[in-house]
């Protein structure tokens, strides 16, 4: 059996999600850029549903900050 090196990364986040508007402001980009990154699969987002459980065209979109942190951590240690 081979040995594996274990790496532990602790990340503190005040919130696991951020609206696309907040995220765009933090990155100093437009919401259209965030939408394009979402469509390209670069950003994992959750589209909130209305009271009937249906997604709407103008529904709230939340960016999954945890998914971004996990992806970046994995990419940082690839050789």
Swiss-Prot record:
Keywords: DNA-binding, Repressor, Transcription, Transcription regulation. To phage P22 cox. Accessory protein needed to activate excisive recombination. Appears to serve the additional function of repressing the production of the lysogenic repressor. It comes from the Viruses. The gene is cox. It comes from Haemophilus phage HP1 (strain HP1c1) (Bacteriophage HP1). This is Regulatory protein cox. GO terms for molecular function: DNA binding.
């Amino acid at each position: 059996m081979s040995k594996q090196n274990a790496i532990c990364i602790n990340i503190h986040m005040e919130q696991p999600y951020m609206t696309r508007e907040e995220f765009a402001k933090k990155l100093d980009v437009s919401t259209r850029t965030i939408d394009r990154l979402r469509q390209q699969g670069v950003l994992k987002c959750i589209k909130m549903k209305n009271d009937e459980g249906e997604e709407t065209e103008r529904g709230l979109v939340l960016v999954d900050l945890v998914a971004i942190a996990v992806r970046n951590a994995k990419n940082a240690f690839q050789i």
